[in-house]
Amino acid sequence: MAPRKPSKKVGPQKRPSAEKRVITSKKKQLRNQSFKSKVRTILKKFELAVQSGDVESISAGLRSVYSIADKAVKRGIFKKGKADRVKSRTSERACPAA
């Protein structure tokens, strides 16, 4: 048989699936870290509002904590139990101040 000629296709190079999994998992890890950081920041702002004792900022902070916890569950970053725990603890902190 005659030797095969190399094809002249120009396009994206194929990569092994294991390498692709590494790349996609790193992207997902960065996205998750960023979101978890956002959650921690909102929780810290809520704690500051509780310490200040301002009822309006406490209720706004509680709304934002509930919202971000539910978004984390929806995106698969938190499990439902963790989000429920976060919401329960923040509502406990808000009740004595309100």
UniProtKB/Swiss-Prot annotation:
Annotated GO CC locations: cytosol; small ribosomal subunit
InterPro entries referenced in this protein's UniProt entry, alphabetically: Ribosomal_bS20, Ribosomal_bS20_sf
Pfam families associated with the record: Ribosomal_S20p
Range of residues in the leader sequence: none
A biological process from GO: translation
NCBIfam families: S20
Full protein name: Small ribosomal subunit protein bS20
Originating species: Chlamydia trachomatis serovar D (strain ATCC VR-885 / DSM 19411 / UW-3/Cx)
Lineage of producing organism: Bacteria, Pseudomonadati, Chlamydiota, Chlamydiia, Chlamydiales
